[in-house]
Curated annotation (Swiss-Prot):
Keyword Cytoplasm in annotation: yes
Name of the protein in its database record: Galactose mutarotase
InterPro entries: Ald1_epimerase_CS (IPR018052), Aldose_1-epimerase (IPR015443), Aldose_1/G6P_1-epimerase (IPR008183), Gal_mutarotase_sf_dom (IPR011013), Galactose_mutarotase-like (IPR047215), GH-type_carb-bd (IPR014718)
Pathway given in the UniProt record: Carbohydrate metabolism; hexose metabolism; Carbohydrate metabolism; galactose metabolism
Reactions accelerated catalytically: alpha-D-galactose = beta-D-galactose; alpha-D-glucose = beta-D-glucose
Gene that this sequence comes from: Galm
Keywords: Carbohydrate metabolism, Cytoplasm, Isomerase, Phosphoprotein
Localization per record: Cytoplasm
Presence of the UniProt keyword Cytoplasm in the record: yes
Active site: 176 (proton donor), 307 (proton acceptor)
Enzyme Commission number, as recorded: 5.1.3.3
Quaternary structure and interacting proteins, as annotated: Monomer.
Length: 342
């Protein structure tokens, strides 16, 4: 049984509209999602003692989400991740996007899908958000209709993304939640055990754009096919963290993507997706300056992201999975976040 409660979360400045919060509750999970950026603001998960903790980073008030902050919990688009130099070509025409993370365009530009108000509709077991991205928004061609649907089923949070375009355009939608299974506000994720079901990953240049090589994980720090404890693993390989796309099987079917286990609490997160990739990011750019929920500060490595997605810069890399959505087609992807305890 799932209950859905609708409340006001806050008012946007200068009459920009009302941001609403939707709380989805089952016996195992409670998830708060707001209509600003389709953002997950809280996710309460029980530990093996039955004690619930909030396992996502974020803010208690709307003001937190309106400041400069690293996409906590938000849906990002029209194209998640980086597009090299903020440009791409379709049918011989070059399109220019805002370069909001020098020298590239990141997560849809300066005003991506995370920084707009969506129109909500309550469902029996969740909430659906809708918006129309106008032709030319942030430099992207064509009008794009987008539906993001969150549903709850026991211990599983399901996110479905659908989109339809009036002109050929790249589309790549994901959710940018930062997880800490010890509870948000815990200082780091070093005691998290991570598994990612990927035989290959994408090496990147110094601006975090894939070089074009699809590299086997075998014998590298990127071999996460068997569980590794993050802190030890980062030390063993002398790396400062992950911010890389891992290549999953390219089938459109639901497939196992990743597993995160926090031994002390017993909490386990399993991720399944229809997408061909997942960006594993260990919060390397968090620096402790933002004040989060309950007075928490978020230093480097205090949360991890598993952003299911198409591969970064695929609009410019023909050997990557196709990036374009054409008129008459439908973009349709689903990701499942399944929580349990052991």
């Amino acid at each position: 049984m799932v209950s859905v409660t609708r409340t006001v979360f806050g008012e946007l400045p200068s009459g920009g509209g009302t941001v609403e919060k939707f709380q989805l509750r089952s016996d195992q999970l409670s998830v708060d999602i707001i209509s600003w950026g389709c953002t997950i603001t809280a996710l309460q998960v029980k530990d093996r003692q039955g004690k619930a903790s909030d396992v996502v980073l974020g803010f208690a008030e709307l003001e937190g989400y309106l400041q400069k902050q690293p996409y906590f919990g938000a849906v990002v688009g029209r194209v998640a991740n980086r597009i090299a130099k903020g440009r791409f070509t379709i049918g011989g025409k070059e399109y220019h996007l805002p370069v909001n993370r020098e020298p590239n365009s990141l997560h849809g530009g300066f005003t991506g899908f995370d920084k707009v108000l969506w129109t909500p509709q309550v469902l029996t077991n969740g909430v659906q958000f809708f918006r129309v991205s106008p032709d030319g928004e942030e430099g992207y061609p064509g009008e794009l209709k987008v539906w993001v649907t969150y549903t709850l089923d026991g211990g599983e949070l399901v996110i479905n993304y659908r989109a339809q375009a009036s002109q050929t355009t790249p589309v790549n939608l994901t959710n940018h939640s930062y997880f800490n299974l010890a509870g948000q506000g815990s200082p780091n994720i070093y005691d998290h055990e991570v598994t990612i079901a990927a035989d290959a990953y994408l090496p990147v240049d110094e601006t975090l754009i894939p070089t074009g090589v699809i590299a086997p994980v075998e014998g590298t720090a990127f071999d996460l096919r068997k569980p590794v404890e993050l802190g030890t693993h980062l030390q063993d390989y002398h790396i400062h963290g992950f911010d890389h796309n891992f290549c999953l099987k390219e089938s459109k079917e639901k497939k196992f993507c990743a597993r995160v286990r926090h031994a002390a609490s017993g909490r386990i997160l399993e991720v399944y997706t229809t997408q061909p990739g997942v960006q594993f990011y260990t919060g390397n750019f968090l620096d402790g300056t933002l004040k989060g929920k309950n007075g928490a500060v978020y230093p480097k490595h205090s949360g991890l992201c598993l952003e299911t997605q198409n591969w970064p810069d695929s609009v410019n890399q023909p050997q990557f999975p196709p990036a374009l959505l054409r008129p008459g087609e439908e973009y349709n992807h689903t990701t499942w976040f399944k929580f349990s305890v052991a």
